[in-house]
Design a protein with these regions (language model features):
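Short, charged, amphipathic alpha-helices and their helix-cap/turn boundaries
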Residues: 103-104, 140-143
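Gly/Ser/Thr-rich loops at beta-strand to alpha-helix junctions
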Residues: 299
Length: 339
């Protein structure tokens, strides 16, 4: 029996730049890239890495370049953390697991380090494979919580629920993480929206920017927990923008969404320390008439465009900066794996 499961990158369309601040956000998953987990029964339990987890290099320069691109941590730690958290969950819920062992490996072509949630995609795909292998059914909102727990509790990575929710639910989802909701039920209010409501969107990225998200968000987290008024006001502002974008989608007023996305980024720029190269991406897109904001922690942007002529101008402006542009295909498949 061979189990194959996939998970997809996500775009934070509007709302909080992260998601652990009791705010609101709209995100979507898209299938232009993917992470795949492959699991099959074996005599012993073994976790295999991908090409990014290799430990053999051509020379010292190759090693240094690999570390600069991918850091010191590959995907094996993510798989181990997921298996451990899945086991703990089943033990807590008194779910008896069969005694068979397995080998699991993953492969991902999601651009690394550009704010598309590639790490949580690995965990999500792994969790889906484990659920199929052990025939354990877990509610979607709990799956998202488990993915988050694998990162936060097991690996001590600063993270919130947004990425994990959209990668579990897929499609496009409105999320409300208001404190009263989170306190009452330990997860947010999640509402799937019709992808057909979206205006024409683009995603653009480059793979030589940004830094790990767990580093990027630390300063804002500290300020938020201290009650910094500038940060708390920004979180409320982003939550309000999220409701406005949702209203525009439902009413078919998509021509108004671009300016709201721009406002989302402009507010972010006021409280975050943003790298010059990241800013150039946004400015280049806006120079072509498109809207632009980060998809996540930096390195990739998302925005709206009016027509094919504007898209052509957008591609031209971004190409000058060696930035790749795609039209995202919304991931909304119901099948999570194949045996």
């Amino acid at each position: 029996m061979i189990i194959r499961t996939k998970a997809y990158p996500r775009v934070g369309l509007v709302g909080n730049p992260s998601d652990g601040y009791f705010g609101k956000t709209i995100s979507f998953a898209f299938s232009n890239f993917r992470t795949e987990a492959v699991l099959y029964e074996t005599p012993e339990l073994e976790i295999l890495g991908s090409e990014k987890d290799h430990s053999r290099f051509e020379n010292i320069w190759h090693l240094a370049n690999d570390v600069e691109l991918h850091g010191y941590y590959g995907g094996i730690r993510l798989l181990k953390a997921t298996v451990k958290r899945f086991y703990d969950y089943c033990r807590e819920k008194q779910i008896e697991l069969h005694k068979k062992n397995f080998t699991i490996r993953y492969d991902s072509n999601i651009p690394h380090g550009v704010g598309l949630a590639g790490s949580s995609a690995i965990i999500t795909a792994c969790l889906r494979a484990l659920m199929m292998f052990y025939e354990v059914s877990i509610a979607k909102y709990t799956q998202a919580n488990l993915v988050l727990s694998a990162e936060v509790d097991e690996l001590h990575i600063a993270a919130g629920l947004q990425d994990r929710v959209i990668q579990v639910y897929e499609g496009i989802v409105y999320m409300d993480f208001s404190k009263d909701i989170i306190t009452r039920q330990r997860y947010g209010h999640y509402e799937s929206l019709n992808p057909r409501l979206l205006p024409p969107l683009y995603v653009a990225y480059r793979d030589d920017l940004s830094e790990p998200t767990e580093v990027f968000h630390n300063n804002i987290r500290d300020r938020f927990e201290r009650g910094d008024r500038e940060v708390t006001n920004a979180m409320r502002y982003w939550a309000g923008l999220t409701d406005k974008v949702k209203c525009c989608l439902v009413k078919g007023q998509t021509e108004k969404i671009g300016e709201l996305l721009n406002a989302n980024f402009d507010q972010r720029r006021k409280i975050y320390r943003l790298g010059e190269e990241n800013l150039k991406m946004v400015e280049a897109a806006r120079s072509a008439g498109a809207s632009a904001k980060f998809t996540g922690s930096g390195g990739a942007i998302v925005g709206t465009y009016q027509d094919q002529q504007m898209l052509k101008q957008l591609k031209k402006a971004l190409c000058k900066l060696n930035i790749k542009l795609i039209k995202p295909k919304i991931a909304s498949s119901k099948g999570k794996g194949r045996v």
